[in-house]
Amino acid sequence: MTVEYRTLSLTKHRSSPLSTIPDHVLDSTIDLYFLFCHNQPYAFFHEATFREDFDNGLISEFLVLSILTMSIRFSHEPYFQGRQEQLTTEYALRAWNLVLHECFSSEDGLDYHAVQAATLLAIHDFTGTVTSAHNIEGSRY
């Protein structure tokens, strides 16, 4: 069986956690986001447009990680089993760090994907596992 890996616009680096997730796992976890999280209570995406942009590699790494952070808890994929809490924390921290980098170092201004990701991560932190502020690079409250 051949496992395919999608190359996202910002995930070409081997250091990205997304580089190790098979496409079918990404797809099924995104399905779970739209099934259980989208419109609960916020609708951040037009689903068809999001999926098209995702398939074309136009969704940033931090936004995909934010979506995974929200939806891994609903997954029964063997890839996540026994590591859901660990991976959720890892993905949330990586996403927060990337969002902060995007917000404070981009010369192009703030990207709306950063706002979507930050909001999803804030909801996650508020309602579930709190990502400790001292673990986020450059952030000390």
Regions found by a protein language model. Give the residues of each.
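Acidic, Ser/Thr/Pro-rich intrinsically disordered transcriptional activation regions
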Residues: M1-Q116, L120-L121, D125-T127
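Classical protein tyrosine phosphatase
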Residues: T131-Y141
